[in-house]
Each structure stands twice: as C-alpha cells, then as structure tokens.
Amino acid sequence: MKTYVLKVEPFTKFDEPKAQALKPLEEAAEVFGAWQASGIDGAGSITPEMREDIVYECFDTIQSCVNLLESIGTTDAELRDSARKVYANNVERGRYDPY
C-alpha cells in the first residue's frame, strides 16, 4: 500500500477560533474548484499546470488542518489514535485491504 509521509510545520500564529475552524472548509472548496477546472472527470485531459494546482490546493488543505490541530493543542498520540481509527473504519467500509 502506498503511504505519503509529509513534513507539515504548523503555524505559530493563529486566526480567531471560528476562522481557524472554517479554514479547512475554505481550502477544501478550492481543491474542488481546481479539480473541476481540470476536466479530470473524463471530459478532457489534465495539463501539468492543472495537476500542479490540484496538488497545491490539497496540500494547502492539509496545512490548514494541521494548523487547526495545533491551535487546539493536539498531541502526537491523539493523531496516531485517530489515524488507527480512520484506517479501521476504511477497511470496514471496503476501501482497501488491511496490511
């Protein structure tokens, strides 16, 4: 199974709490916009620029989620526990075979 290992440094300055919580939603909408603009749904071929835009917006979403986690004081242990739970749920849903 392919696994992405990323280094994401959380911000040290945060927006007010509601704005911080809304940021991942805003960034996720930008991912959808980039995907929509790419025509990747089968209507056409994706250009390298469009692919780069999708990847950029996905990472921007990851960054905003990491910032939110940092702003509420999330620990590594909490992240590992949540990762295990999400993995188990996805196996249960048949999204991939367990390793």
Language-model features: where?
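Flexible "arm" and connector segments at domain edges
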Residues: 1-99
